[in-house]
Amino acid sequence: MCGIVGYVGNKQVVPLIIDCLRKLEYRGYDSAGIAVVNESHDLEIRRAEGKLRNLEEVIRLSPLDGTYGIGHTRWATHGRPTEENAHPHRDCTGRIVVVHNGIIENYLQLKEQLRKTDHQFVTETDTEIIAHLIEEYLKEHHNFEKAVRRAMLDLKGIFALAIINADEPDMIIAVRQGPPVVIGLGDREFFVASDIPPILQHTRDVFFLGDGEMAIINRDAVRVTDFEANSVQPTIQRITWDPIMAEKGGFKHFMLKEIYEQPRSVRDTMQSRISLDTGRVFLDAMKNITEADFKRFTSIKIAACGTSWHAGLAGKYMIEQLARIQVDVDYASEFRYRDPVMDENTLLLVISQSGETADTIAALREAKELGAKALAICNVQGSMIVREADGTILTHAGPEIGVASTKAFTAQMVALYLLGLYPVSYTHLTLPTIYSV
């Protein structure tokens, strides 16, 4: 899982990008790199195998400067973990550079096509062909934005991209088809990242790109379109997390810190959702799911991956015991391939900490096509799953940086209890029952 960052603004870009990359280290990586355009419109790249400190040493020995650029932490998929294969990658002219999270499935076919028009490749990666493909379409369209958009239509696979062209000053184009891309909004400055924590100390105002969308970012504005050039209005949200929650705060590592944050995540997830006077449970983000729907549901199916799937397994017992509704649990990657039986009397419950888990999103879409309602338990407001679900129980656990889930899992368990209590809270739920739970 690679990490991408980008910045356009008035600050010195190198220390800012290095700091953002450091906050993406939890995703895992084997190399790192940065590309910056300086005031003379020269594009400079520094890359290093291994840890981020190796890249910092390369930059110390060979400094670079500028006010916009992109950075990357790579986890090798195509090509060995070497400096040569580290991102960013450039085209033949050396003026277009790309960082990429994902996999291009048809890169070998595209590579052969590009070789026929004299493109020269210097790495073993699938990413490099993207820069060359944009270069090729730039010759045809003479417009960077159009060239990027046309190139995207040729790619098969999943990809999150940040792209710069040294001949287009103060511009970054960010693209999403699968992996998450977050755009941060500042005062005449904009940020691109794979996740919220890297940019949290710089801005609280963000939006997520949707699949098949691209953001054209310059120093003054950001504009979003789809791959067909249709304008898209992004949904901007304000992140309420305290930036300190994305720091270790004196703990030896994030996992230990997040273990100690579990009581807070439980409290914040329950906050204002249970009336101790009446015993009523309130789920406040049910966009298209009513009390009448809950009374109609005859079964619940849970689809999730990883830790969220384990939460779902435990949640099955909670919901069946409390709400007396039959519950089945599926691993999200298998859900849509087993031809599930669902209709308007079925509720699909999808669980995802990030709200961007690809297989869980696919399960949600499958269920909605079959006429079922979809409810999400999620930790990230504005994420893809939250946007597409008919209702959401936000867990309010704050950013979870540790790879082994702790507080996010605990908050999911609380949300599952709330869901189990909800259908009966407006009929026969008593305060002793709440206290016993």
Regions found by a protein language model. Give the residues of each.
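Glycine-rich phosphate-binding loops that contact phosphosugars or nucleotide phosphates
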Residues: 295-425
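Conserved short alpha-helical segments that host acidic/polar catalytic motifs at enzyme active sites
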Residues: 1-253, 261-298, 337
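Alpha-helix N-cap/helix-start and coil->helix boundary motif
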Residues: 104, 127-128, 309, 316, ...
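Single conserved hydrophobic/aromatic residue that forms the stacking wall/gate
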Residues: 428-437
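An acidic-aromatic substrate-binding cleft motif
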Residues: 258
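Conserved core segment of the aminotransferase class I/II
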Residues: 111-112, 424-426
